[in-house]
């Protein structure tokens, strides 16, 4: 995932889906693709079976939007979101999980939304709309 100045490869919105349940990851990725087609947004949707796999891929680029499960083997989705924030990344985080216990922790990592499984298209689309809006408002950062 090579990123441009505002995130995304040459204007392509990079969306990462991270869920250890293959069926859930495929459903969420499919909904994200449906959202992009419906909005006329060019997007690349990648799936990852663990937070560790997504962390490893950060060397290739940071996603614009991360759709994260929370409870996974190894690092949790919440730990991944905290790491992204510690690194200063502007990745827009949406939690899609069946664990309600961490809903308030989402505020600590400035999550766009916290959705319960099974993912509903209307709620995921609204969360992706919000994430895209936030990305559009992001101020460019100069690192020297």
Regions found by a protein language model. Give the residues of each.
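Non-catalytic signal-transmission and effector/linker regions of two-component phosphorelay proteins
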Residues: 1-16, 29
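Switch/coupling loops of ABC transporter nucleotide-binding domains
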Residues: 13, 43, 91
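Conserved sequence signature across two-component system core domains
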Residues: 18-19, 48, 66, 96
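Two-component/phosphorelay signaling modules centered on CheY-like receiver
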Residues: 22-46, 86
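Helix N-cap/capping motif at the beta->alpha junctions
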Residues: 47-53, 77
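CheY-like receiver
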Residues: 56-139
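C-terminal output/effector regions of signal-responsive regulators
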Residues: 143-144
